[in-house]
């Protein structure tokens, strides 16, 4: 959602507090499930709105023509407002990075997309710092796929495999690049880059070093054990925090 108040209004105006009993049929069981989702949405929307109401304004100005920045603007308020959600997912809408055509050079479409990403992340980090939440916030980027090395016939690049990602925040081990420069000559049979690290090594680092889980939990979550890249300082936020206790008591 783009606005906590709008989300609350949407749920609040389209719910019913009383229902007739669902029939004792397969369809009735499905109806009960839908109703349970509705009730959970009511509780969730009130919790989200309460967190947003505690912090009415951000400490930095986010450009409204940058969709990612607008999303991170909301996330920053909700974190500062005490919402105990551990993972926030924001995305760049549409197929912006799916640059099959007219990808451009240093001033082209892809360069502008990276500039928007840089601007949004920079403002978010500054905002968290000024709101006093930076010690508890880290972020990472990911994508469904990378891009092929060779240019296609439309001045773009097609779907590929390996791709870089960024990790950011106050308590990461920053200023480092993991891996070597991509080998643009020795490719796989389809012309794709050969990966150096499995992306799940980044998720393993997030679980072990940031959330403070153990190896068993990491293995269950990722369906096998992975060696974690050294990405986060030894200041894990853990699954339970003082903020959780504070939020639950409000």
Predicted regions and their residues:
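Feature for exported/extracytoplasmic and membrane-associated proteins, marking the mature portion
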Residues: 1-131, 150, 164-170, 176-236
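Phosphate-handling catalytic cores of nucleic-acid transaction enzymes
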Residues: 159-160
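Glycine-rich, charge-dense phosphate/pyrophosphate-binding loop(s)
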Residues: 133-135
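RTX-like calcium-binding, glycine/aspartate-rich low-complexity repeat tracts
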Residues: 236-250
């Amino acid at each position: 959602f783009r606005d906590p108040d709008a989300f609350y209004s949407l749920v609040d105006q389209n719910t019913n507090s009383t229902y007739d009993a669902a029939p004792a049929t397969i369809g009735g069981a499905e109806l009960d499930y839908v109703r349970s989702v509705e009730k959970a949405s009511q509780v969730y929307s009130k919790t989200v709105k309460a967190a947003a109401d505690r912090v009415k304004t951000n400490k930095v100005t986010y450009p409204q023509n940058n969709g990612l920045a607008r999303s991170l603007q909301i996330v920053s308020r909700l974190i500062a407002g005490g919402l105990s959600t551990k993972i926030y997912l924001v995305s760049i809408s549409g197929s912006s990075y799916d640059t099959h055509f007219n990808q451009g050079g240093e001033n082209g479409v892809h360069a502008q997309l990276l500039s928007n990403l840089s601007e949004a992340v920079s403002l978010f980090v500054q905002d968290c710092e000024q709101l006093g939440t930076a010690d508890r916030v880290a972020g990472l980027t990911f994508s469904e796929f990378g891009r092929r090395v060779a240019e296609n016939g439309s001045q773009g690049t097609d779907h590929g495999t390996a791709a870089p990602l960024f990790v950011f925040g106050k308590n990461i081990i920053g200023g480092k690049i993991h891996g070597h420069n991509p080998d643009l000559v020795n490719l796989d049979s389809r012309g794709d880059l050969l990966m150096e690290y499995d992306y799940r090594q980044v998720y393993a680092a997030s679980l072990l070093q940031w959330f403070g889980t153990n190896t068993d939990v990491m293995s269950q979550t990722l369906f096998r054990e992975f060696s974690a890249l050294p990405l986060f300082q030894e200041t894990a936020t853990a699954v339970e925090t003082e903020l959780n206790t504070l939020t639950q008591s409000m």
